[in-house]
């Protein structure tokens, strides 16, 4: 959307039997890399394009961001099941966007942002706990230094 390069036709892709998945586009054309945000953008843009509130429902979009994406790349993940990779996010339900508890999936797709993610577990390893990544100070310092070098070249 930022580059105004067109709008994806969700319904046509479904009719054609295309497996729909979600991903982030990369920082060069989509300054953020949040799958939570991408779920909302995918759901709302599909509804706007089709002029139908029943297109790209929350459960479908959540699946596009999880199990469908993993399956498309042949990764044994995307759902919690015996024999699958132990990948999970722990969500902080005490965030304002998560208060309405009629549908956790709906809240994640339409109301949440990445700040609701408390803990990230990938292949059984805790990568982020209580919103802290080991070594994040050094990672941020390196990022700031790299950004400063890029700005200096302009």
Question: Whereabouts are the PLM-identified features?
Answer:
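His/Asp/Glu-enriched, well-ordered alpha-helical/loop segment
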Residues: 11-95, 109-113
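Active-site microenvironment of metallo-dependent hydrolases
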Residues: 65-154
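Helical hairpin unit composed of two closely spaced alpha helices linked by a short loop
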Residues: 3-4
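Charged helix-capping and loop-helix junction motifs
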Residues: 7-10, 105
């Amino acid at each position: 959307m930022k580059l105004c390069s067109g709008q994806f036709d969700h319904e046509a892709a479904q009719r054609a039997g295309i497996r729909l998945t979600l991903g982030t586009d990369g920082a060069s054309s989509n300054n953020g890399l949040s799958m939570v945000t991408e779920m909302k953008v995918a759901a709302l843009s599909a509804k706007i394009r089709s002029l139908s509130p029943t297109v790209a429902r929350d459960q479908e979009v959540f699946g596009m961001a999880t199990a469908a994406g993993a399956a498309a790349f042949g990764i044994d993940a995307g759902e919690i099941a015996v024999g699958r990779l132990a990948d999970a996010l722990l969500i902080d339900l005490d965030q304002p966007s998560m208060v309405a508890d009629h549908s956790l999936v709906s809240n994640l797709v339409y109301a949440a942002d990445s700040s609701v993610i408390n803990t990230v577990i990938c292949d059984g390893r805790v990568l982020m706990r209580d919103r802290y990544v080991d070594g994040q100070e050094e990672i941020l310092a390196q990022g700031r230094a790299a950004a400063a070098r890029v700005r200096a070249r302009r």
